Amino acid sequence: MGRILQFSDVHFGCEHKHACAAALDYAHATPNDLVLITGDITQKGFPDEFTAAGEWMRAMPEPRFVIVGNHDVPYWDAVARVLHPWRAFETATGFPAHDGQFLGKDVMVRGVVTARGWQARPNWSKGVIDLDQTRRAAEALRQAPIGALRILACHHPLIEMVGTPMTGDVKRGDEAALIFAEAGVDLIMTGHVHVPFAMPIPLADRCSYAVGCGTLSHRERGAPPGFNQIDWDAKTITVTAQAWDGSSYRSHQVWRLPRRQDTRNAATAPSPVEPGALEKAFLPDAKP
């Protein structure tokens, strides 16, 4: 029924040039419904990095949807980090940093920002998701068309992955993941850790999954440069991690995920107007 190509952590400034060029060729040779880029398009947020990233993204087939990552803030510009951390990203990509959304024939994607220009903790690379943003995203997911694949896209994994080389350490991430699952999300698609993964979100017996993407940079963390191809039909979501072997892309890992069925029927889908129990519990101001 559909296909998405997910790229992440290209990190222009230390990008893998051959892998990036081959990714463009792959995207144009492979029919798809959306090219999704989940943040960290630059390494230090320098103007020339944003220029290169923008050119690469605009060379991708349409439609495209791009969200921001923690490396997409001007690293050495303290004023920009505090006052307008995402201006350069928005100028380069043409996409808003906050509350972006894509609606296709069979898929809906909602973007949220988990990166910050600065934080009240030493490691600013870690993630944060705020309550208002969670509320707006949950409402959007609940209102997705019946039968559409529902995706929440952000840069940091909302729940911690076992065995990955680093963490997202997202403030309020566990709660947000459960709220989004309750709201009907099929996939929470992320980057940041530079290795691919797919795992279920633990909420009752529903089939919502966290899916992570590798990197197209030289900042490898135990996995070759690569990206994800997501194919789905009425019953199954197939996540294929494509890996660069030095000359071409090959299938590196495959996950076949049973697709949740409640969102395919109006009688069983989450209410588009009434917040769920977890949404009400974690977000006290949630209102129908």
Question: Where are the regions a protein language model picked out?
Answer:
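N-terminal active-site segment of His-dependent metallophosphoesterases
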Residues: 1-59, 75-76, 136, 143
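Beta-strand-turn-beta hairpins that frame and shape the catalytic cleft
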Residues: 1-5, 100-111, 142-149, 202-209
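Active-site environment of divalent metal-dependent phosphoester hydrolases
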Residues: 13-15, 43-48, 70-78, 116-123, ...
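A short C-terminal boundary segment appended to hydrolase-like catalytic domains
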Residues: 232-288
